[in-house]
């Protein structure tokens, strides 16, 4: 069965999701996108990407549609998600990637329009279920869960890092810092912003700011609820981020034991979600990788303190998790 997908919001994540689906999934079909931008601009930004390069097929704009190779994708321009004709288009799952409709009550408008399920590409409020693949996807219940949050890009990396370490040696408490690429929420030049640090020029500064990843961990790993705290350092790179997790463990361990746990996870149950690397990487090395990467060489143990580091492409990796999640949900429709 081919699962029919609608994308609401054709920005960085929406276009990355489109590319990820085109690159690797014959089980999913993108049938429509909704965005208030004009069609020629949307087609151009899909065809030419500053990070991912040229789209591998010809992309052209048509009246009310984008043509990609021999496929035609309908383009809608509705402000109100409840007015979208998902039912008429036969859409099974909507990927909500505007960053606006993160409240489940608003996202549910897609269901009112005929979609069967909604995946919110962000942390959400009031959702039926928040999922990090490899951590709690086994708890997904198609009968009870209609509005599903895919958490954040950082939570997807942190969740796997924390789960593997917690299963191996037990986590008592910890701190996480994500050194994160700048995003559209920041300013190109100094300008007003509700977060006065994010008000500063993104390409010129290291910008300390908040991260909701620690709170979200409690949703996907309830045994760690309230045990982790976190913040972010936004840095002047366009994509490619790294999570530094430092914890107090419940028992003594060694660098070798920690590495062995991650090596086993990467070659076993987390294959495709987590890779194990010994090479001395920098951020550009992981751009375009769909998995999070455990950097074995940065592992440290000092008494009861353990530090582990995981890289992730905050755009491409997260978009691939959205495709994985849509495939999982689609398998039980």
From Swiss-Prot:
Protein family: Belongs to the glyceraldehyde-3-phosphate dehydrogenase family.
Gene symbol?
gap1
- Which residues bind NAD(+) per the record? 12-13, 35, 79, 314
Pathway as given in its UniProt record:
Carbohydrate degradation; glycolysis; pyruvate from D-glyceraldehyde 3-phosphate: step 1/5
Q: What InterPro entries does UniProt report for this protein, alphabetically?
A: GlycerAld/Erythrose_P_DH, GlycerAld_3-P_DH_AS, GlycerAld_3-P_DH_cat, GlycerAld_3-P_DH_NAD(P)-bd, Glyceraldehyde-3-P_DH_1, NAD(P)-bd_dom_sf
**Gene Ontology CC: one annotated term:** cytoplasm
Q: What is this protein called?
A: Glyceraldehyde-3-phosphate dehydrogenase 1
Induction of its expression: In the presence of pentalenolactone (PL).
Lineage start? Bacteria, Bacillati, Actinomycetota, Actinomycetes, Kitasatosporales
Subunit structure, per the record?
A: Homotetramer.
Listed under GO biological process in this entry are: glucose metabolic process; glycolytic process
Q: Keyword Secreted on this protein?
A: no
**The organism of origin for this protein:** Streptomyces arenae
**Cellular localization per UniProt:** Cytoplasm
**What does it catalyze?**
D-glyceraldehyde 3-phosphate + phosphate + NAD(+) = (2R)-3-phospho-glyceroyl phosphate + NADH + H(+)
**Activates thiol group during catalysis, annotated site positions:** 180
Q: Which UniProt keywords apply?
A: Cytoplasm, Glycolysis, NAD, Nucleotide-binding, Oxidoreductase
Q: Which residues form the signal peptide?
A: none
What positions constitute the catalytic site?
A: 153 (nucleophile)
Please report a single Pfam family linked to this protein: Gp_dh_C
């Amino acid at each position: 069965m081919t699962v029919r997908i609608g994308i609401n919001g054709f920005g960085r994540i929406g276009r990355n999701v489109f590319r990820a689906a085109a690159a690797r999934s014959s089980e999913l079909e993108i049938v429509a996108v909704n965005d208030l931008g004009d069609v020629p601009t949307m087609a151009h930004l899909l065809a030419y990407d500053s990070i991912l390069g040229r789209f591998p097929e010809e992309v052209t704009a048509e009246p009310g549609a984008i043509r990609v190779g021999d496929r035609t994708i309908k383009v809608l321009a509705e402000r109100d998600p409840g007015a979208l004709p998902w039912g008429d288009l036969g859409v099974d799952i909507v990927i909500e990637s505007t960053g606006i409709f993160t409240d489940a009550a608003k996202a549910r408008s897609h269901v009112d329009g005929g979609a069967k399920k909604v995946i919110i590409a962000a942390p959400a409020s009031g959702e039926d279920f928040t999922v990090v693949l490899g951590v709690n996807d086994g708890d997904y219940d198609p009968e009870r869960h209609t509005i599903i949050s895919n958490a954040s890009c950082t939570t997807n990396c942190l969740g796997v890092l924390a789960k593997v370490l917690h299963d191996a040696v037990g986590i008592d408490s910890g701190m996480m810092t994500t050194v994160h690429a700048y995003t559209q929420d920041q300013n190109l030049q100094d300008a007003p912003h509700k977060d006065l640090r994010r008000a500063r020029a993104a390409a010129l500064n290291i910008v300390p700011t908040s991260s909701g990843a620690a709170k979200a961990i409690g949703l996907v790993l309830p045994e760690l609820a309230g045990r982790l705290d976190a913040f972010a350092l936004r840095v002047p790179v366009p994509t490619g981020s790294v999570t530094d997790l430092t914890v107090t463990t419940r028992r003594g361990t060694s660098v070798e034991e920690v590495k062995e746990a991650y090596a086993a996870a990467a070659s076993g149950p987390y294959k495709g979600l987590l890779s194990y690397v010994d090479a001395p990487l920098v951020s550009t090395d992981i751009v375009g990788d769909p998995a999070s990467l455990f950097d074995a060489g940065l592992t440290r143990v000092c008494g009861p303190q353990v530090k582990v580091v995981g890289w992730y492409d905050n755009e491409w990796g997260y978009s691939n998790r959205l495709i994985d999640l849509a495939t999982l949900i689609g398998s039980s429709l």
